[in-house]
């Protein structure tokens, strides 16, 4: 695995950080994302994006990167909303994704983060990874999981997390275990040629991306760009599409392993494909 260096200390020299948002600040985030959702929803309805996935995939190519999570979440939940859904978010230091989920109707949102967080809102809970892991071991489950630009940092120590070379793979397994059997995860990672940038982040390509996705069925990748997904460019100018994932069950894994052994599959990272796992074989 190629290695580059760009060292960042987000621990305040080991003292740790505490990000606090009072009710007024969170209400501001909520109103901002509610307005963005309303604007995007009106556009999506006018353009018929809900009923035409191909058109949605083409349209999101022209949407600024920072809005991709909003567009994809709305696309999947505009009809059913997140009403009565429990959401877990892995890695955040400000409640933008939480506000987005509340805007989509989430019942409650749990945020898992190494830094100290205080979100003063009745529907928001913050928790450290070890405590969250214990809740999962005790059988607690969530309907929806989000990890936006988070797991690529896990195990590199930038945010005070333990140094674990496979911290990102472990995080994916924890997210899978935390989901209900038919739960859905939304994931973004920097894509390109495989690279570990110590201690900034990882970039995922043909070597490590299949390992990250090996326990998942890929329902879609938005927006998908085959060329950008394997570029070996500036590691600070990242391409991070939104992967929409569902945990694989044992029967499905057994059938797909049989297909692989029989040579009945091909490798393809295209949107909606789950062949990323097959490349790992």
Where are the regions a protein language model picked out?
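N-terminal accessory regions of S-adenosyl-L-methionine
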Residues: 1-86, 103, 198-207, 211-212, ...
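Class I SAM-dependent methyltransferase core
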Residues: 88-92
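Class I SAM-dependent methyltransferase SAM/SAH-binding core
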Residues: 93-135
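A short acidic, Gly/Pro-enriched loop at the edge of an enzyme's catalytic core
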Residues: 135-146
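A conserved beta-strand element that flanks and buttresses the S-adenosyl-L-methionine
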Residues: 146, 151, 155
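A short glycine-rich, Lys/Arg-flanked "PGG" loop and its adjoining helix->strand segment in the class I
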Residues: 163-181
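Conserved beta-strand signature within the Rossmann-like core of class I S-adenosyl-L-methionine
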Residues: 182-190
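Conserved S-adenosyl-L-methionine
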Residues: 217-228
């Amino acid at each position: 695995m190629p290695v580059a260096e760009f060292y960042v200390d987000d621990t305040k020299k080991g003292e740790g950080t505490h990000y606090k948002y009072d009710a007024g600040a969170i209400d501001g985030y909520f109103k901002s994302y509610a307005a963005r959702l309303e604007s995007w929803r009106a556009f999506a309805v006018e353009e018929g994006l809900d009923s035409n996935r191909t058109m949605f995939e083409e349209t999101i190519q022209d949407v600024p990167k920072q809005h991709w999570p909003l567009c994809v979440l709305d696309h999947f939940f505009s009809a059913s909303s997140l009403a009565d859904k429990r959401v877990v978010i892995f890695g955040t230091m400000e409640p933008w994704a939480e506000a987005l989920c509340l805007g989509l109707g989430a019942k409650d949102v749990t945020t898992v983060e190494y830094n100290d967080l205080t979100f003063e809102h009745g529907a928001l809970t913050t928790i450290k990874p070890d405590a969250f892991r214990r809740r999962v071991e005790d059988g607690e489950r969530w309907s929806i999981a989000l990890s936006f630009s988070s797991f690529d940092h896990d195990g590199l120590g930038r945010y005070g997390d333990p140094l674990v070379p496979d911290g990102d793979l472990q995080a994916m397994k924890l997210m899978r275990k935390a989901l209900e059997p038919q739960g859905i995860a939304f994931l973004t990672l920097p894509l390109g040629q495989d690279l570990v940038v110590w201690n900034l982040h990882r970039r995922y390509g043909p070597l490590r991306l299949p390992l990250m996705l090996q326990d998942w069925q890929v329902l879609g990748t938005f927006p998908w760009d085959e060329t950008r997904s394997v570029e070996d460019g500036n590691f600070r100018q990242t391409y991070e599409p939104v992967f929409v994932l569902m945990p694989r069950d044992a029967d499905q894994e057994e059938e797909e392993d049989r297909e692989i052994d029989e040579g009945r599959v091909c490798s393809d990272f295209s949107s909606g494909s789950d062949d990323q796992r097959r490349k790992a074989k």
